[in-house]
UniProtKB/Swiss-Prot annotation:
It comes from Xenopus tropicalis (Western clawed frog). This is Cytosolic carboxypeptidase 1. Binds 1 zinc ion per subunit. The lineage of its organism: Eukaryota, Metazoa, Chordata, Craniata, Vertebrata. The active site is at E1097. It is found in: Cytoplasm; Cytoplasm, Cytosol; Nucleus; Mitochondrion. SUPFAM superfamilies: ARM repeat, Zn-dependent exopeptidases. Residues 366-400, 1182-1201, 1206-1226 are annotated as: Disordered. The keyword Glycoprotein does not apply.
C-alpha cells in the first residue's frame, strides 16, 4: 500500500515539477526585461533531461489543452543564447522522435515551421555559424517538413533553400553536417518549383558529386544523396541537365559496380536509389534515348536476371522492369489500318460521331500510329498505380445524374398511337379467340413430341451416374491429362465446294478407297458409364435420321457440297452427322491427321458411343445447324463452320476453379518481351495468318501452327510467329469501327504434344482484366470431342494481362495521346498431336445456334400447354432476321372467362445479347427459354401468371461477324435507346417500338430485364433505377431520405439473392448515371415507365461468394441463372400478391418484410472496382508508366464502389429448384 502511495507521490511530483519549469519559462517570456540567460539555460536543461528520460513529461508538454508547446516555442523565438537554443531544439527533437506524427502536427499548428526557418535564417547571418546548431536545426526540420504541406513554399519564401544548399556546397567533406541538410532538401524537392530553383543554383552537379562507386563508408549519406537526387530529377529541366552532362551512362556504371560488389545484398536501398534516379531521367524522351544509347536495356536486364533468385531483391527487379518497359521503343501494330479488315457500306451516313469521323478521314491517313506515340514525357507525379488512381475517385463520382427532373420517370412515347399500330401484329395473344383450338381435353394431340427434358442445375449431380465413374472422370478431366487410347479419330476430308449431289455414289466409292482407317480404343467401362449419362431414358426405338448408317456397318464419309448455292440443302447434310457416325462437313476448315494409320476393330464401338450425346443435347441438331448457317448472312460471306458449333457443347462434369496465379509470372512474361529488343536475332517475326492479305497461306512446315477464324462469330485478324513456340495474335476491330478488341474465337491446328505454346493477344484496350484474377480462356478439342468429351473447358497457365509497347494512335482513342495497348498472354500444352482446337474468350453462342435452339424448342413444346409464337421483328443491316418470341400458357378453354384471363396477364419483357462479345448473356437466356418451355409445375404456373415477350438477340449482325460491342453501324446499340435510327439501329428501334406499343395500350410490362455480361466483376448482379438512391449518392439534397419512393425495384434482386447461388445482392446498384442515360435499362424506366427495369450482368470469370466461390463460371451455372430468374419472377408474383396463393402465415410475413425494407440502404454505384481486383503480392505494375485512367471510350466497363449496403433479410425457399423442362440444358 505504501509502495503504491510512493509511486503516486512521485508521479505527482514529476507533473508538478514540469509544470513549475514551464511556468518559469512563461514568466520570462511575459517579461523580456527580466530575462536571465543563466536561469533560462538551467530551466531548459532540466526540461530536456526530463524529456529524455520520461515519456510522461513528453506527453505533458504536448498534451491537448497544455500550453507547454507554446511556451517552449515562444522561448525559442525570444532567446539569443546559443545553449538555450540548443536545449530547446533538442527538446523538440525528443518530442518529434516518439509518437512523432501527432506531436509534430501540434508543433506545426503552433507556428513551429515558421519559427524554425526564421532561426535558420538568423543563424546563417552570424559571422561564424555554429555547426552543432545547424546540424540539430536541420535534423528537426527534416522531421517537421514531411508533415507540413506548405513547408516547401515556406522554405523557399524565407530563403532557407539557399542556406541549406550552401551548407552542402561548403561541407562536402563533412558528412555529419550535410546529411540532415540533404534530408531537408529532399523534402523541399517535393515542390516542383523548388526543384527547378535548386537545379538553377547547381544542386544537380553538387549531388552527383556525392554519388560514387561501391564503398563501405558513409553509406547513409550516399542513400540520402540518391533519394534527394532522384527527387530533384523529377523536374524535366533537371533531367535534361543530367542527360546533357552524361549522367545516364555514369549512373549505369555506378549501378553495375554496386551490383557486382554488394554480394551480401546489404545495400539494396542504395542500389534502388540509383534506379530511382534513372527512372526519373527516363520520364523524358531524351532521357529514354540516352538510356538506350548507353546500352541500359541490356545492363538492367542482365542485373535483373541475376537478382531474380533472391526474393528480397524484388524491388530492384520491379523497378528495373518498369524502367525497361518505359524505354522500350513504342511500336506500331503490324497492320495497314486499325479499321476492321471487313468493310460494310451503311445505308445512310451518320452526320456526327466516331463512325462519321472514321469515314471522313482521307484514305492516305495512317491511323495506326501518329507523332504522339513517342512523345509522352511522363511526369513522375502521375506515376501512381492505376488501382490507386481509381481508389482516389471513390470520393466523388461526377457521372451520377443530379438533375431531379431527368430522374423522374414518365411515359414519353415520342410516337403516335397510329404509328405504333404497326406492332399490333406482334401481339396476336391479345386478339386470339382460340375458337379453332381444342382446349377442353388435357390429353396431348396425336403426334406431338412430348417427353420432358430435365434442365440440370449447376449444383446437382445426376443420380444415374455411378460415383466411381464420376471420380475417375473428374480425376482425368481436371488434370487435362487424357489417355492416349482415346486420342485417335477418323480423318476429316476437305472437299471442293463445287461438287454437287449428283454422282455422289460414284465419287463416294472412289474416295472410299483412299480413306485411311483410324483406330479408336474406348474402355468398356467408359462406354458403359457414358451410356448412363443420358438425362432422359433412351428410347428403345429411336428413329434414325435420313441416310443414317447402321451401327453394324462401317461408316463411309462421303463428300457433300455445303456451299450456300446448293439447291437441295436437305441431301447436303444427310451424312454430316449421322446417328452412328460423325463427320465435319466441308464447311469445317481444317483436316485432321490421325495419330497413326493403323485400323482398329473398335471403330464401330467408338462411333456408336457418340450417339449418347443426342440425349445430352436435345436442342442441338447438326443437320439443322448446317441448314441455318447457309441462310445466315455475314459480311465476309463465311463458308465454313466451326466444329464446336456444329457438334455442340456439353457442360463438363467437373468444376473449374479460379486459377491461382504463381508469383512472378507477369514479371517473367515482361522480361521475355524485353528480350525481343535485346536479342533481336532470336525473333522469327513471320506472318502465318492474315485477313488483310489473302495470299498469306498457312505454312507447310510441320513445326508451325495453323490458324483460322473464317467462321461465324470468329475473330482473329493476324498471327505472327515470334519464336518457335510463341505467337502474337491481333484481333479484328468491330466492323465500321477502329477499336473494341476483346472478343476472340479462332482455330489452331498442327500442334505437337509436350510443347508449351505461348499465345499473346497484343491489341487489347481495357486497362485491366479478370485474366489477372483467376480467369482462363476456353478451349475445345476436336479429338476430345471424338473421345466423348465434347465440351469447352478452361485452359492456360502463366496467364496475365499487362500494358505492352504497342502504341494506340490518337485516332483510335478519341484524341487522347500516348496510350498503349495491352496484352493477354497464356501458355497451353496440347494433349493431342495434330489436333484441331478452338480458343474463345467465353463460351461461343452464335446466331445460327440461337435459331437452331428456337426451332428445336418449338418442335418439342406441348401446344396444348404452351402458347409459343416466333416471329421476325425486323431485318438487320446485314439482312438477317431478328426473332421475337412470345411465351405464355394456353387458356384452360376457349370460354370467354379463360380467354379474358389469358389476354390480361401482365407482361414480362426480356432482351439479350446487345453486345456480341457477351456470350454469357445468351447462355442465361437459353436457361430462361428452356425453363419457360418446360413441363414442370413451376414453369406452367409461371406461364399462367405472365406473358413473356422476348428478343433473345438484339445484335445478330455483331454476333455473326465476330464483333465485340457494336453492330454493323459501328455503334454500341445499348447507347442508342433514346433516339434509335430505324435505318442504322433497326433492332433497337423496333424493340423500343414494342415497348412503346405496350405502354400506349396501357399494358406496360411489370418487369423489363436486359441480359448482359460483365468482364471486370465476378458473380451475377443487377443494375436498376432509383431516384432516391441516386440523389443519396450525390449528397445534393440532405433531405433525400425523406423522399417517398416505392422500393419494389429491390424485390426481384433480393429474391434472386435467395434463390440463385451465383447472384450477389451486394454487387447490385440502383444509381442512374449520366453515361447510362441512353441504355435500355434507363430509357425503359424513364420513358416507358417500367419501375422494375434492370440490366442483369453475368460474370465472364467466376464467383467470389456463395456456393460457387472460387469457381469459374460455366454454361451450366449460366443456364441455371436463367432458370432461377424465372423462379424469381414466380416468387415476385407471390410477394406482390401474397393472398393469391395459400402460403404459410410466417412465410407471408417474411416476404412482406422483404418488400417493406428500408430504402436507407446505401447502394454502390457502377464506378470503381477495387476489392474485386485486389493488388498482388507481386508489386509489378501491369502498365508501363502506371498512369492509366478509366477508358473514356469504354465508360460502362468501370467498376463499383465498395458495397455499403446493409445485409439483406432472407427467407427460406421451399420451391422445387430442380426444374423439368421440355428443353435440355447443354
Amino acid at each position: 500500500m505504501s509502495k503504491a502511495k510512493a509511486t503516486a507521490d512521485k508521479c505527482l511530483s514529476n507533473n508538478s515539477r514540469i509544470q513549475s519549469l514551464l511556468s518559469q519559462l512563461e514568466k520570462v517570456n511575459a517579461e523580456p526585461l527580466l530575462f536571465d540567460s543563466d536561469n533560462t539555460r538551467y530551466v531548459t536543461a532540466k526540461i530536456l533531461h526530463l524529456a529524455q528520460t520520461q515519456e510522461k513529461t513528453r506527453k505533458e508538454i504536448a498534451a491537448k489543452g497544455s500550453t507547454g508547446m507554446e511556451v517552449i516555442l515562444c522561448t525559442l523565438e525570444n532567446t539569443r543564447d546559443l545553449q538555450t537554443i540548443l536545449n530547446i531544439l533538442n527538446i523538440l527533437n525528443e518530442l518529434a522522435s516518439t509518437a512523432g506524427g501527432r506531436r509534430i502536427n501540434a508543433l506545426i499548428s503552433k507556428g513551429g515551421s515558421r519559427i524554425l526557418l526564421q532561426l535558420l535564417l538568423s543563424a546563417s547571418k552570424e559571422s561564424s555559424s555554429n555547426e552543432e546548431l545547424m546540424m540539430v536545426l536541420h535534423s528537426l526540420l527534416a522531421k517537421v517538413g514531411p508533415k507540413d504541406k506548405k513547408f516547401g513554399i515556406k522554405a523557399r519564401v524565407s530563403g532557407a533553400l539557399n542556406i541549406s544548399l550552401n551548407l552542402v556546397k561548403q561541407n562536402l567533406q563533412n558528412p555529419r553536417l550535410i546529411l540532415p541538410c540533404l534530408q531537408v532538401l529532399r523534402v523541399c524537392c517535393m515542390n516542383s518549383v523548388n526543384s527547378v530553383y535548386l537545379g538553377k543554383n547547381g544542386a544537380v552537379e553538387i549531388l552527383f558529386k556525392l554519388i560514387g562507386p561501391f564503398t563501405r563508408r558513409n553509406t547513409g549519406l550516399i542513400k540520402v544523396s540518391l533519394d534527394t537526387f532522384a527527387a530533384l530529377l523529377k523536374s524535366k529541366t533537371n533531367a535534361r541537365k543530367a542527360v546533357d552532362r552524361g549522367y545516364v551512362q555514369a549512373l549505369l556504371s555506378i549501378y553495375t559496380d554496386w551490383h557486382r560488389h554488394d554480394t551480401r545484398h546489404r545495400h539494396m536501398l542504395i542500389r534502388k536509389g540509383i534506379l530511382q534516379c534513372l527512372k526519373s531521367i527516363t520520364n523524358i524522351k531524351i532521357g529514354r534515348k540516352a538510356f538506350i544509347d548507353a546500352n541500359g536495356m541490356k545492363t538492367l536486364y542482365n542485373t535483373s536476371q541475376e537478382c531474380q533468385a533472391v526474393r528480397t531483391l524484388d524491388p530492384l527487379v520491379n523497378t528495373s522492369s518498369l524502367i525497361m518497359r518505359k524505354c522500350f521503343p513504342k511500336n506500331r501494330l503490324p497492320l495497314p489500318t486499325i479499321k476492321s479488315a471487313f468493310q460494310f457500306q451503311l445505308p445512310i451516313m451518320p452526320t456526327s460521331g466516331p463512325v462519321a469521323l472514321l469515314y471522313s478521314m482521307p484514305p492516305e491517313v495512317d491511323d495506326v500510329v501518329d507523332e504522339s506515340d513517342d512523345n509522352d514525357d511522363t511526369e513522375a507525379e502521375t506515376e501512381a498505380e492505376a488501382e490507386n488512381e481509381e481508389s482516389d475517385q471513390l470520393c466523388k463520382n461526377d457521372d451520377i445524374e443530379t438533375d431531379i427532373t431527368k430522374l423522374i420517370p414518365g411515359q414519353e412515347l415520342g410516337r403516335t398511337l397510329e404509328d405504333l399500330k404497326m406492332y399490333e401484329r406482334f401481339f396476336p395473344e391479345l386478339t386470339e379467340d382460340f375458337q379453332e383450338f381444342d382446349l377442353v381435353s388435357n390429353e396431348p394431340k396425336p403426334g406431338a413430341k412430348l417427353g420432358p427434358i430435365i434442365v440440370p442445375t449447376a449444383g446437382e449431380e445426376q443420380p444415374e451416374v455411378p460415383n466411381n465413374f464420376m471420380k475417375d472422370l473428374e480425376k482425368r478431366s481436371c488434370n487435362i491429362s487424357l489417355e492416349d487410347e482415346c486420342n485417335k479419330r477418323p480423318t476429316f476430308l476437305d472437299m471442293p465446294k463445287n461438287v454437287t449431289n449428283k454422282g455422289n455414289d460414284g465419287l463416294g466409292q472412289q474416295v472410299h478407297g483412299d480413306i485411311d482407317r483410324s483406330c479408336y480404343y474406348f474402355s468398356s467401362d467408359i462406354v458403359k458409364d457414358l451410356e448412363k449419362l443420358s438425362l432422359r431414358k433412351p428410347s428403345g426405338n429411336h428413329p434414325c435420321r435420313n441416310g443414317c448408317v447402321s451401327a453394324k456397318d462401317k461408316p463411309i464419309f462421303l463428300p457433300h457440297p455445303c456451299n450456300k448455292s446448293t439447291s437441295n440443302s436437305g441431301s447436303c447434310s444427310n451424312n454430316l452427322f449421322e446417328k452412328h457416325s460423325m463427320h465435319l462437313s466441308p464447311l469445317c476448315c481444317s483436316g485432321i491427321t490421325p495419330d497413326d494409320d493403323e485400323s482398329s476393330p473398335l471403330d464401330e464401338l467408338a462411333m456408336r458411343e457418340i450417339t449418347d450425346f443426342d440425349n445430352l443435347l436435345p436442342l442441338h441438331d447438326p443437320d439443322l445447324y448446317i441448314e441455318i448457317v447457309k441462310n445466315t448472312k455475314s459480311v465476309p460471306e463465311y463458308s465454313e463452320v466451326a466444329y464446336p458449333d456444329y457438334f455442340g457443347h456439353v457442360p463438363p462434369f467437373f468444376k473449374e476453379r479460379l486459377l491461382e496465379r504463381p508469383y512472378g509470372v507477369q514479371r517473367s512474361k515482361i522480361f521475355q518481351d524485353i528480350e525481343r529488343m535485346i536479342h533481336p536475332n532470336d525473333i522469327i517475326d513471320r506472318v502465318v495468318y492474315d485477313l488483310d492479305n489473302s495470299s498469306c497461306s498457312a505454312q507447310d512446315e510441320s513445326e508451325v501452327l495453323k490458324f483460322n477464324s473464317k467462321f461465324e462469330s470468329g475473330n482473329l485478324r493476324k498471327v505472327i510467329q515470334i519464336r518457335k513456340n510463341e505467337y502474337d495474335l491481333i484481333l479484328n476491330s468491330d466492323i465500321n469501327s477502329n477499336h473494341y478488341h476483346q472478343w476472340f474465337y479462332f482455330e489452331v491446328s498442327g500442334m505437337r504434344t509436350g510443347v508449351a505454346y505461348r499465345f499473346n493477344i497484343i491489341n487489347c484496350e481495357k486497362s485491366n482484366s479478370q485474366f489477372n484474377y483467376g480467369m482462363q480462356p476456353l478451349m475445345y478439342s476436336v479429338q476430345e470431342a471424338l473421345a466423348s468429351r465434347p465440351w469447352w473447358y478452361r485452359v492456360g497457365m502463366d496467364i496475365c494481362y499487362y500494358k505492352n509497347h504497342f502504341s494506340r494512335s490518337s485516332i483510335a482513342t478519341g484524341g487522347q495521346k500516348g496510350k498503349s495497348y495491352y496484352t493477354i498472354t497464356f501458355t497451353v500444352t496440347f494433349p493431342h498431336r495434330d489436333d484441331v482446337c478452338y480458343f474463345a474468350y467465353h463460351y461461343p453462342y452464335t446466331y445460327s445456334t440461337l435459331k437452331m435452339h428456337l426451332k428445336k424448342l418449338e418442335s418439342l413444346h406441348n401446344p396444348q400447354q404452351v402458347y409459343f409464337r416466333q416471329e421476325v421483328l425486323c431485318e438487320t443491316l446485314g439482312g438477317n432476321g431478328c426473332p421475337v418470341i412470345t411465351i405464355t400458357a394456353m387458356p384452360e378453354s376457349n370460354y370467354y372467362e379463360h380467354v379474358y384471363q389469358f389476354r390480361n396477364r401482365p407482361y414480362i419483357f426480356l432482351s439479350s445479347r446487345v453486345h456480341p462479345g457477351e456470350t454469357n448473356a445468351s447462355w442465361v437466356m437459353k436457361g430462361t427459354l428452356e425453363f419457360l418451355m418446360g413441363s414442370s409445375t413451376s414453369a406452367q404456373s409461371l406461364r399462367e401468371s405472365y406473358i413473356f415477350k422476348i428478343v433473345p438477340m438484339l445484335n445478330p449482325d455483331g454476333v455473326i461477324n465476330g464483333n465485340h460491342r457494336c453492330s454493323l453501324s459501328g455503334e454500341d446499340l445499348n447507347r442508342q435507346w433514346q433516339n434509335p435510327n430505324v435505318d442504322l439501329h433497326p433492332t433497337i428501334y423496333h424493340t423500343k417500338g414494342l415497348l412503346q406499343y405496350l405502354a400506349a395500350i396501357r399494358r406496360t410490362p411489370l418487369v423489363y430485364c436486359d441480359y448482359h455480361g460483365h468482364s471486370r466483376k465476378k458473380n451475377v448482379f443487377m443494375y436498376g433505377c432509383s431516384i432516391k438512391e441516386t440523389v443519396w449518392h450525390t449528397n445534393a439534397n440532405a433531405a433525400s431520405c425523406d423522399m417517398v419512393e416505392d422500393s419494389g425495384y429491390r424485390t426481384l434482386p433480393k429474391v434472386l439473392n435467395q434463390l440463385a447461388p451465383a447472384f450477389s445482392m451486394s454487387s447490385c446498384s440502383f444509381v442512374v448515371e449520366k453515361s447510362k442515360e441512353s441504355t435500355a435499362r434507363v430509357v425503359v424506366w424513364r420513358e416507358i415507365g417500367v419501375q422494375r427495369s434492370y440490366t442483369m450482368e453475368s460474370t465472364l470469370c467466376g464467383c467470389d461468394q456463395g456456393k460457387y466461390k472460387d469457381l469459374q463460371i460455366g454454361t451450366k451455372e449460366l443456364e441455371e441463372m436463367g432458370a432461377k430468374f424465372c423462379v424469381g419472377l414466380l416468387r415476385l408474383k407471390r410477394l406482390t400478391s401474397p393472398m393469391e396463393l395459400t402460403l404459410p402465415p410466417s412465410l407471408i410475413d417474411i416476404e412482406n418484410e422483404l418488400i417493406e425494407s428500408s430504402c436507407k440502404v446505401a447502394s454502390p454505384t457502377t464506378y470503381v472496382l477495387e476489392d474485386d481486383e485486389p493488388r498482388f503480392l507481386e508489386e509489378v505494375d501491369y502498365s508501363a508508366e502506371s498512369n492509366d485512367d478509366a477508358d473514356p471510350d469504354l465508360p460502362d466497363t468501370i467498376g463499383d464502389f465498395e458495397n455499403t449496403a446493409l445485409e439483406e433479410e432472407g427467407f427460406s425457399d421451399s420451391e422445387i429448384t430442380r426444374t423439368h423442362t421440355s428443353g435440355q440444358s447443354t
